């Protein structure tokens, strides 16, 4: 069976993610020590003692499935920002939320606009759902809002 024939065209056009080199490899190749790697959104100082305490506190319950709706967290966020908890969406990081948005609002007949210096996930999720991605050149390393307006045609989503 040829999987490429049955897989969504947008998925077939994606390239696999290539993670950055492990810090150990980089130090060995460059002959350096104590490098601080920031490229992969890693924290060079590790978790705070408070975070470690909280992890220890909840560790005893890790054999149970968590609340898939994140009810308590949604309630806390909704109170803090004075919105209804139904207006709060929880995901596993920004990539997850961006993918929810693309899957909800885009299809193969749609397009999405993003700036050339926008988050790298925007074009990936647009392509994955088979929509047309429209990359608008930046102006002085900023979003060119006038160019974004001019690029609008059959638009479904703008990523800023």
Regions inferred by a protein language model and the residue ranges of each:
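Phosphate-binding glycine-rich loop
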Residues: 71-111
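Conserved beta-strand segments of alpha/beta enzyme cores
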Residues: 34, 87, 132-134
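Conserved small/polar residues in nucleotide/adenosyl-binding loops
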Residues: 158-160
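N-terminal "arm"/small-domain region of PLP-dependent enzymes with the aminotransferase-like
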Residues: 1-64, 143, 149
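Short beta->alpha connector loops at strand-helix junctions that form conserved
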Residues: 116, 132-139
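Hydrophobic residues at beta-strand termini and immediately following loops
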Residues: 38, 65, 91, 136
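Conserved PLP-anchoring active-site segment centered on the Schiff-base-forming lysine
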Residues: 104-125
């Amino acid at each position: 069976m040829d999987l490429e024939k049955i897989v969504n065209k947008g998925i077939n056009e994606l390239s696999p993610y290539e993670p950055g080199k492990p810090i150990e490899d980089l130090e060995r190749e460059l002959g350096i020590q104590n490098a601080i790697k920031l490229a992969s959104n890693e924290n060079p100082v590790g978790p705070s003692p408070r975070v470690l305490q909280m992890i220890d506190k909840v560790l005893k319950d890790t054999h149970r499935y968590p609340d898939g709706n994140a009810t308590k967290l949604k309630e806390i966020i909704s109170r803090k920002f004075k919105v209804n908890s139904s207006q709060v969406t929880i995901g596993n990081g920004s990539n997850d939320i961006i993918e929810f948005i693309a899957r909800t609002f885009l299809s193969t007949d749609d397009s999405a606009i993003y700036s050339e210096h926008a988050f790298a996930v925007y074009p990936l999720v647009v392509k994955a759902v088979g929509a047309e991605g429209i990359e608008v050149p930046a102006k002085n390393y900023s979003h060119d809002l006038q160019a974004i307006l001019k690029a609008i045609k059959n638009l479904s989503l703008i990523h800023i």
